[in-house]
Curated annotation (Swiss-Prot):
It catalyses: 4-CDP-2-C-methyl-D-erythritol + ATP = 4-CDP-2-C-methyl-D-erythritol 2-phosphate + ADP + H(+). Transmembrane segments: none annotated. Keywords: ATP-binding, Isoprene biosynthesis, Kinase, Nucleotide-binding, Transferase. This is 4-diphosphocytidyl-2-C-methyl-D-erythritol kinase. It comes from Synechococcus sp. (strain JA-3-3Ab) (Cyanobacteria bacterium Yellowstone A-Prime). The gene is ispE.
Amino acid sequence: MQACTLIARAKINLYLEILGSRPDGYSEVAMILQSITLADRVHLQRRPHGILLICDHPEVPADARNLAYRAAELLQRECRAELGVEIQLEKQIPVAAGLAGGSADAAAVLVGLNQLWGLGLTVGELQSLAARLGSDIPFCVQGGTQLATGRGEVLQPLADWEGIPLLLAKPRHLGVSTAWAYQAFRAHRAASLPSAGASLPTLPQVLAALERRDLLALARSLRNDLEQPVLAEHAIVGKLRQALLEAGALGSLMSGSGPTVFGIMASLERAAQARDSLCHHFPEVDFWVTQFAPTGILLEPDPQALRLP
């Protein structure tokens, strides 16, 4: 195999609870992570040596600041791979949006180079390497629906719930740093009363809703502890959450560190209708109709391989 193309899917957080601080500087979390069909395309081409990264998005770096580039470097170093690669990223997942776009691209590079370079690594071995690059990348390697604990790298797969319709909304010119969001949460928690989180949904509630396939219960069980500090700084996030609910969403939540907000919709048709209506009211916001997906990374079939003699 000389080249391959992978679909790298975004994720949303159906649940994000911050349990405390860790000695390594990260936060101890409990999260439900869900792959969605919004995705980047990652093209990999073997080279004799070196790493070349090309991206069609002006805000995405094409050097070692990029997680996809660092994923290739890590595999070269750890597996003593002497080959190189050209990485081309076709971005559809917005940048700094709380959707793990950079993490998904890095996961695609790990999965793709494992095939392209013939490394023979297992999914578990790829996830162990991924954890050294970022907390979301181990999830993105496999995707689907998973419970994530630790700093997000300890994963427990849950039963997939494919095809649940979503409407995503992201302010076009707003990005939120994950590090800033966690710092803001700590400051917000320090200033809050001890009982402030008493009425929030709990992990057993969202797990039970997923197990029963109860969409209304799931919509009522959404939780993101990073949401309040981000809302305090960026009022548009709260306005979008409310707008999604008024447009028919069964439940709405900010994903990850934001600022993207998603609404769980009753159908793809309702999601498209809501998108068309909200576009007129929020011209500076980008909207996507998407849905739950059962996997994180897909290897596109080689068109040449599918051609009959």
